[in-house]
Amino acid sequence: MTLKSRMALLSLILLAVAGSWAASGQAAETLSPDVRRLQTKWEAIKFGVPEGDEQTKQMNALGEEADAVAAHYPAMPEALIWDGIITSERASMASAFSALGLAKRARDILDQAYNIDPAKLDAGAPTSLGVLYYRVPGFPVGFGDKAKARQLLEQAVKLAPNGLDAWYFYGDFLYTQNECAKAVEVFQHALKIPQHSDRPLWDKNRRLVIEELLAKIQEKK
């Protein structure tokens, strides 16, 4: 495979990831003001700014803020998780030549959070890592690894029985592996999870995506 074709493949797959990065709910957890600000801004940019140059510009600016927060709180998994999520989002918006570098950086940041506490933010670290491992291409283009993704996402749903993102992304992974019957079970569980009244925009959009995927599976029958 030529470098040009590798970049084209990477670009297509990362484009498909856009809009899918985990943003774990944490109704029962108290975030620091700095981390809460990152979460609020991410939601405003993600769901309130149309896709395109302006959204990318704002997400990149938020990425600089997230890097600073993570540097200030290097032992706080919540800060690292949100830095990883935002860096992942930037990767999904970037050109093919910079996307993989951002994805690798997001992986490394999330690994740090995972090593501190994999259960934090409804298993935000293993969930977000799992997304990276099943959405980024594998060798020789990238570091994707379906087996590792499965292991991380299975761990995430065990750690977060009421984690909407953990269950959504596990179901989405199963759907991409054509394990549709299991995916339906997982998606149905996700929809039964109590709504996050403190994050209505994210909660509504995540459930809409789950319902759309359930409809796609039903159409295949």
Model-derived regions, located:
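N-terminal leader/linker segments that initiate helical-solenoid repeat arrays
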Residues: 24-65
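Short coil/turn linking the two alpha-helices of tandem helical-hairpin repeats
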Residues: 38, 43-52, 89-98, 121, ...
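Short coil turns that delineate tetratricopeptide repeat
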Residues: 74, 118-120, 161
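TPR alpha-solenoid repeat register
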Residues: 79, 123-125, 166, 200
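Terminal, low-structured helical/coil segments at or just beyond the last alpha-helical repeat
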Residues: 186, 192-221
